[in-house]
């Protein structure tokens, strides 16, 4: 309010020429006021008639510049309002010996300044229920309300500023607003900021972990992509090998055709060579016979002439058949090769596409229906051996790796009582009957080592026995075994059970200290042949909250 009044008042004290507060104001006959220096400079620039810069009234001669005394006094008082008074020096009220020292702290509730050496002395003085509120002496002016000249000890929730009690309760600007003590609000803000700081630190740590995981995943993907590139290169080398094989077969076709032609050509040449030898032989005989005709005694016997003439007539009587020459139709052969090239080019020119994206970003922790990250970490800590359920290697993983989610967390969804074959469900490889989540004893591990022998038990007719290694109970692989009661429990099962993740105390450790991984099935069966074999089918301890398969 006071600030607005000052601004409005200042607008009436501004010179129209320099637009600042009047400096030695003078008044013209038209009753307009200007700074003496401003109006003098304005008229000095105008060589013609002098005019009032505000109303443009012309004067034949320059009027006298009379000082406006009333306006001068108002300007001086207005300027005095803007002059900040030097703050009064505060001295310690507890200094008794010698002159008091300058105050370093001021208690806003007690309004008592104190020096640095008497801060503890002041804090030990009795105060209001809210206690002392010390601030720096230099900040006292900032904590003072300019309107009521009182310390601002309250915090307005509506406007988020510190206010004094008069602003809150006595028709002040913050009347009706929700306020609280400034120290209480400060503690609340500190708690809120500390809580947010913890959240931000956790978020920063989470982001840092995710960045590390992203970097690790990047390196892993780069390695796998490099492996994939090598495999792709090998595949393309196989394609090159196929092309080389096709080229070899094509060249082989040409070689076979050439060999066939050369064979036919050689046969023709051989036949013509034989005809030539025969003709040369007859020609020689004919020449010798012609030489004999010079003697008249030749005419005594001319039978040789007739024989030679007949043979010559036979040789020359038939015409020579034209030879068969080779005709290579290269265009026809190249057309067939061009067809293959066209088909291959058409196949390779198409974009390389896969049915689904082969490299994509997926959530880091895929959430199951009945699982959570905390449970997974808890389970992995309690049962590190259960990791074989997630792999396909080993006898159990190969048989029950895809048996569903009933035992994926190693936890039964039903309360555990005396075990029956309808609890802790998994699917056997050969059927869909629900059985205990445990491996079937391999037939090869029984005493005689036969691959066809089944564990023959007198009271259970040779049915396969399934083991739940957490609840330490047995059941038959047959889901409905004629209404047979669950196997009774006992405290004589020969292995120790880990105590972590159990919601109940375990009974004393059995007398046999051998652990499950070191106990062979043969030892179990040997133990079943002893007089106390009925305890072999009983369970050890109380039901646990988790069931998982073991081998």
From Swiss-Prot:
It is an enzyme of class 2 (transferase). A zinc finger (RING-type) spans 15-56. A zinc finger (B box-type) spans 92-132, 140-182. Keywords: Coiled coil, Immunity, Innate immunity, Metal-binding, Repeat, Transferase, Ubl conjugation pathway, Zinc, Zinc-finger. Pathway: Protein modification; protein ubiquitination. Its EC number is 2.3.2.27. High expression in heart, liver, and thymus. Expressed in embryonic CNS, kidney, lens and gut. GO terms for biological process: canonical NF-kappaB signal transduction; host-mediated suppression of symbiont invasion; innate immune response; negative regulation of viral transcription; positive regulation of autophagy; positive regulation of canonical NF-kappaB signal transduction; positive regulation of protein localization to nucleus; protein K63-linked ubiquitination. Pfam families: zf-RING_UBOX (PF13445). Residues 399-457 are annotated as: Disordered. One of its GO terms (cellular component) is cytosol. SMART domains: RING (SM00184). GO terms for molecular function: protein homodimerization activity; transcription coactivator activity; ubiquitin protein ligase activity; ubiquitin-protein transferase activity; zinc ion binding. Homodimer. Interacts with SOCS1 (via) SH2 domain and SOCS box. Interacts with HSP90AB1; prevents nucleus translocation of phosphorylated STAT3 and HSP90AB1. Interacts with MAP3K7/TAK1. Interacts with PIAS3. Interacts with TICAM1. Interacts with TRIM15; this interaction prevents TRIM8 cytoplasmic translocation. Belongs to the TRIM/RBCC family. This is E3 ubiquitin-protein ligase TRIM8. It comes from Mus musculus.
